[in-house]
Amino acid sequence: MVKLLNSTRELSINALSMLNSFGDMVAQATGLNRKLLTTDSSDATARRLLQISNAKPNATVALDGSGQYKTIKEALDAVPKKNTEPFIIFIKAGVYKEYIDIPKSMTNVVLIGEGPTKTKITGNKSVKDGPSTFHTTTVGVNGANFVAKNIGFENTAGPEKEQAVALRVSADKAIIYNCQIDGYQDTLYVHTYRQFYRDCTITGTVDFIFGNGEAVLQNCKVIVRKPAQNQSCMVTAQGRTEPIQKGAIVLQNCEIKPDTDYFSLSPPSKTYLGRPWKEYSRTIIMQSYIDKFIEPEGWAPWNITNFGRDTSYYAEYQNRGPGAALDKRITWKGFQKGFTGEAAQKFTAGVYINNDENWLQKANVPYEAGMMKV
């Protein structure tokens, strides 16, 4: 399926250079320091990308009317059909109360804000209100080669409202950079296809990073919020249904920590790294900081059953922090006790999602292909 989509989904190097240049302009305007990480600093393509300048947004959105559009939806309506180059939408600071759905036919959309806490897209739909989890999302992305930078995505439904998605990504080669993704249960839906998250903050309570995409999160802050009373928290809930599927959630050099008011509940909540949403659930946490609030077992069963215990795939490698000790971890068959550096390498961004296409290098975002120096 991926090969069939490549011809319509591949961004040109020149177009991505425009994206990089404009991204640098926004970073300078917001005071963000952008550090480039590539596999080869002498790479000729990277040098050419850095030389392109003077990119301008195709559309500007501002609540106060100072842009071409007042809503993000209006700007998206201006994206040409069968778009083959980045269509850059600059969204000025403000709280945008909109529900956004970028269709599969709308490819190469680039959303750039003025900061992850300054430009915010917010909603509050939840399954308690009637829609399915898939349709609770504040922002849903289906078009390939999507990029978001310096934006906040939010679902404010609250811990009692059950599933309520802030951002759903169902697009191949999606990049989310320096964004804040806030919610409670089911905050970030890494639904399907290849996706890369860098320098983001994701907050939530139950299963708040979930789905069956090929998702790599690098240098992200994963913050567990105060849940509802008597509610246990689960960082991940990966959804692989067959062993041949490529889906996995990979956290590399991330920080897993509690929010400031997490411990205010009495009795205190229990938090786990994840649980098997589907039978062949697969999650790898490596080179990350795990705080002491994570239960020693590390991983939890699905609703106190044996579901997925033998067929899931949970691995931890080179983690640090008081919650990273492996001596009391679960003894399920699905827990990879002898997980090696060679096995971990297969889930690095350069191997797992970038492979021979080098789409991450072409996008010129901060990116580490292999194991990181931590």
UniProtKB/Swiss-Prot annotation:
Give the positions the UniProt entry annotates as the active site: 186 (proton donor), 207 (nucleophile)
Q: In which pathway does it act?
A: Glycan metabolism; pectin degradation; 2-dehydro-3-deoxy-D-gluconate from pectin: step 1/5
Q: Name one GO cellular component term.
A: extracellular region
Q: Which cysteines are joined by disulfide bonds?
A: 200-220
State the InterPro entries in the record: Pectin_lyas_fold, Pectin_lyase_fold/virulence, Pectinesterase_Asp_AS, Pectinesterase_cat, Pectinesterase_Tyr_AS
Quick one: which residues bind substrate? 133, 163, 275, 277
Leader sequence range is 1-31
Residues at the site labelled Transition state stabilizer: 185
Expression sites (tissue/organ): Pollen, and at much lower levels in pistils and petals.
Residues annotated as glycosylated: 58, 124, 230, 303
What are the record keywords, sorted?
Aspartyl esterase, Cell wall, Cell wall biogenesis/degradation, Disulfide bond, Glycoprotein, Hydrolase, Secreted, Signal
Q: Is Nucleotide-binding among this UniProt entry's keywords?
A: no
Q: By its UniProt entry, which Pfam families does this protein fall under?
A: Pectinesterase
Please give the biological process terms from Gene Ontology that the record holds: cell wall modification; pectin catabolic process
Q: Which reaction does it catalyse?
A: [(1->4)-alpha-D-galacturonosyl methyl ester](n) + n H2O = [(1->4)-alpha-D-galacturonosyl](n) + n methanol + n H(+)
Query: What is the similarity comment for this entry?
Result: Belongs to the pectinesterase family.
Role played: May play a role in pollen germination and/or tube growth.
Query: In its UniProt entry, what is this protein called?
Result: Pectinesterase
Record the organism.
Petunia integrifolia
